[in-house]
Amino acid sequence: MRRWLITLLFMLCCGVSFAQQHDQQQLQKLTQFYNYLRSNYVDEVDLEPLVEEAIKATLSELDPHSSYITAEDLQRMRASFSGEFTGIGISFISLRDTIIVNRVLEGSPAAKAGVKKNDRIIAVDSTSLVGVSTSEAQGKLRGEKGTISTLSIVRGKCDNPLYINIKRDDIPTKSVSLAFRLDNNVGYVRIDSFLSRTLAEEFTQQVNTLGSIDALIIDLRNNSGGLLSSAIRLSELFLNRGDLIVSTDGRKENSTYFASKNGAFRKLPLVILTNEETASASEIFAGAMQDHDRAVIIGHRSFGKGLIQRLVNLPDGSGIKLTIARYLTPSGRVIQRPYQNGDRESYVRDRERYNHLDSVQLAELPTYTSLRNGRTIYGGGGIHPDVYVTLTGESLPFVSALRQSKSISEIIVSIFDSVDIDSFLDRYPTLEAYTNDFTLDREAIDLMISRVHSFNPDLTDDPEGLNKAQDIIKAQIAEEVYGVGTYYLIFGHREDQMLKSAHDIASNPASIRTLLGYSD
């Protein structure tokens, strides 16, 4: 017996040694190839792009999330994780070869310099932006902190440009983009990302501004994630001290993360919205809430991005994100959905399959048990909602054509070419006055009809669709004039099928308890 064990150990050690020797030979082979190439190729060879492509090709054969990052992109990524960006503080769209400002961040250098929404930027430092792509324009507008650029701007119907000097500076970012009250004492908060280290504090502040509420809807749709620490701290707000939030399973190290205190909102009824773009840190939060029977998840199956990447810095300032472990929800579910190494195209395409229950065969999925009430929850990658909402689509042909033609922004810009926001507020000083009294003028309606029929010449008359399209434009104008969130207040919660389902459930806390398996 002892001799057999010694023989087995010897064979295992030899196997490891042979494997290590083989790996070393492959590395030497690669080094020898590049040295020979550099010394003997007929022309002088720049190795930098070749090495970059080799790294990218290698990583592409692994999991879908290991990737190479250029030095420039790595610098921007670090800025995003610090919660601050350097720039002028605007976002913009390209409309008919023109760069048009669609958002000016409050307190940003652009806001202080007088840039306004719907301004057309025709040049930066005498370099024309007419006809350039949004990515090219973004490159021209970027710069180091403290540098100054002159924007040439056309405003409204005035042909003479304005020249505005802007000094680039740090721009604090917000993770919570919307927070408001719906009917029946239901609060609504939309979290766009988990990139900010102060997300939990920002979230708490926004919820407290809502006053006394009986239930809360957290919208995580299209939230691509961010920091693990932010997901943990947000989860703590809704859990009891000692509750498991997430664990990791890796080749070299495993970790577990628990709530360090009783959460301020641990007794607040909670509904969470997810879709196929809800990923990473947002899935950690949603998974913890579902596993502890703290929230009803509504919408679509989430993306299923549950791999942990470690950033490895390379000497030239670039880096690689290398997958080192997997995230597990408190019940032991793997968040990462299945993938085939090297097949990233199918991986990205498949996420769109999970937008309704019919495409998800629950009977084929591994089942788990929730931690408080023992109800059945499903694994197999991503967070499966407790209530699936199948989107029926916008059946009205005119509305569908309007959205597909991407003409809404053009119509909004044309309206504000004729009247500025201050004049608008003089006429409609409150949102209530605007909602009751404002109607689109004939010029805006004709432009909308023209754009829709240019997109689809065969479209027949659709009076109901035309009326709904006017409501959509009206709600978008409200967003421009009265601030972020007003679109949802006057129209969005009626149009948004997922939000409507969430509101119906949140309006009845007893239904939340029933769905979560509580017995009263």
Predicted regions and their residues:
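Extended, small/polar residue-biased N-terminal targeting/export presequences
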Residues: Y41-N102, I148-L178, S230, G492-H503, ...
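Hydrophobic beta-strand signal
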Residues: I122-A123, V296, K321, Q336, ...
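Polar, glycine-rich mid-to-C-terminal structural blocks
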Residues: A281, D293, G304-P366
